[in-house]
């Protein structure tokens, strides 16, 4: 039996821990807050996230070193912009898992690190010293609440080492969760990071009262700019046509369960950034920070991303949503 440590007890970390346990994997969850670890261990539920979901038998702890002891699969389930700081604190125990148990590090985080413009797999490699072949990423249309409820879903596990991707696939395959494998780590990560930004745009449009034509146009043109950036960075175009691209984008842009869409909806309806934060119950809307780093990454590679730029201007430069829409519609017309 595979032994997994899930580091992070937010919505997605909790839901994925349930997936692993349902697949027959031995799971220990690390929670930052001691009271959450206690509830997970004794009540098999997370009172802060997904409180109505009953988890199978999992262990839980507030001690990351204890969670990592003997782990063959390490699931990194913390927000993208705090990943580096967490990895730095966990580094000795992570190195022990790698050196003693040949552990695979699996990132659930979706984002581009602010400042360095690194993808999450690159941050993991830089901080832990893990070889590229040991690092995998998971991306797809994976809304945590639906998966925790056992609703059918699919995802992509990408790793340059196909055998490791297959091992993670086996450890997370259940009757309701179907993982596919891929070796295109770049494509999966760029798709996962950028879709949050486009979801903000779709939420803004919905909040403004715009209709399905507008939303469909944003999703389609959003995919076009995501694909431009991903291919420039070395991704395979077909990856963006799959679960880690179109699949993730559609789910995040259209579902009321999407934090990024919900955040954008408040802005589109005339609410402030503070009101939008309250609407997501204090949980991270990754696209708010990602739009800055994705925009900078695109600029560094001379890739045009007008939707990302518009979202950044609304979230960080104070322009109104109507100004943003006007600037997009006023762009020079061109072939598709």
Curated annotation (Swiss-Prot):
Entry's localization field: Cytoplasm
The keyword NAD belongs to this UniProt entry's keyword annotation: yes
Domain of life: Bacteria
Organism: Nocardia farcinica (strain IFM 10152)
Biological process annotations from GO: carbohydrate metabolic process; glycerol-3-phosphate biosynthetic process; glycerol-3-phosphate catabolic process; glycerophospholipid metabolic process; phospholipid biosynthetic process
InterPro entries: 6-PGluconate_DH-like_C_sf (IPR008927), 6PGD_dom2 (IPR013328), G3P_DH_NAD-dep (IPR006168), G3P_DH_NAD-dep_C (IPR006109), G3P_DH_NAD-dep_N (IPR011128), NAD(P)-bd_dom_sf (IPR036291)
The protein's name in its UniProt record: Glycerol-3-phosphate dehydrogenase [NAD(P)+]
One Gene Ontology term of the molecular function aspect: NAD binding
Name of the gene encoding the protein in the UniProt record: gpsA
